[in-house]
Amino acid sequence: MICMYRIEVEDLNVYFDEAHILKDINLKIPKNTVTALIGPSGCGKSTFIRTLNRMNDVISGFRHEGHVYLDGKDIYDPDMDVVELRKKVGMVFQKPNPFPKSIFENVAYGLRVHGYDDRDFIEERVEESLRAAALWDEVKDKLDKSALGLSGGQQQRLCIARTIAIEPEVILMDEPCSALDPISTTKIEDLIHKLKNDYTIIIVTHNMQQATRVSKYTAFFLHGEIVESGLTEQIFIEPRDKRTEDYITGRFG
């Protein structure tokens, strides 16, 4: 039986020392779709996506209860290879974070880390990734130049290219447009629409309009809980919970 869900979260609770951050989270993420996570600051959205590639593991006091399944396998099983997990579940952060290397080496870096050393393969994969990130035409003549010289929007697309170079199954995006201007934001949103054909994308956003533009599914977080989740259109047009309605109409948050 083929599962239609890329990620399934069951009864997830997350603690940092005595602080109970996420409470009884249940959520299914379908394959090759965009799911938006919305909610006020401090409600647990970023903590949640960091449970999906075990980035919280490095934070002192972290512990969890419950299950997070990727393609049917619990990522918190003791035999899980965390390096391999993070290859499958890539991450794009709020602020673009290119390495102080050339544009080419920024994209090639992950390939080298994962053991690829064939020059022709790396060159081909770098070009494919930059094209997929809608950046190739802007940088193809300056691949040896520092990535730090790119604009903010270009740097964020470079970070997306770096993420997809190692062919993940899932891309996590933690407010990827919050530091960008409107034109750069539009380019990232257009890119998300294109990437969903090949990847499962989960995006944290405070921008309600962005959530409606880019996602098929939405989950509303509040005080560490999911108030409701479902089709984005339903969440925004006919929310089932008054707290959801109050948030998306700007009554709080």
From Swiss-Prot:
One Gene Ontology term of the molecular function aspect: ATPase-coupled phosphate ion transmembrane transporter activity
Biological process according to GO: phosphate ion transmembrane transport
Domain ABC transporter: 7-248
Recorded topology in the membrane: Peripheral membrane protein
Keywords for the protein's UniProt record, in alphabetical order: ATP-binding, Cell membrane, Membrane, Nucleotide-binding, Phosphate transport, Translocase, Transport
Gene3D superfamilies in UniProt: P-loop containing nucleotide triphosphate hydrolases
Catalytic reactions on record: phosphate(out) + ATP + H2O = ADP + 2 phosphate(in) + H(+)
EC number, as in UniProt: 7.3.2.1
InterPro entries per UniProt: AAA+_ATPase, ABC_transporter-like_ATP-bd, ABC_transporter-like_CS, P-loop_NTPase, PstB-like
Residues the entry annotates as binding ATP: 39-46
Keyword Transmembrane helix in annotation: no
Domain of life: Archaea
Subcellular location: Cell membrane
Cellular component GO terms, alphabetical: plasma membrane
A Pfam family of this chain: ABC_tran
Function: Part of the ABC transporter complex PstSACB involved in phosphate import. Responsible for energy coupling to the transport system.
Entry's family note: Belongs to the ABC transporter superfamily. Phosphate importer (TC 3.A.1.7) family.
Subunit structure comment from the entry: The complex is composed of two ATP-binding proteins (PstB), two transmembrane proteins (PstC and PstA) and a solute-binding protein (PstS).
NCBIfam families attached to this UniProt entry: 3a0107s01c2 (TIGR00972)
PANTHER family documented for this protein: ABC TRANSPORTER I FAMILY MEMBER 17
Name assigned to this protein: Phosphate import ATP-binding protein PstB
Originating species: Methanothermobacter thermautotrophicus (strain ATCC 29096 / DSM 1053 / JCM 10044 / NBRC 100330 / Delta H) (Methanobacterium thermoautotrophicum)
High-level lineage: Archaea, Methanobacteriati, Methanobacteriota, Methanomada group, Methanobacteria
Gene name of the encoded protein: pstB
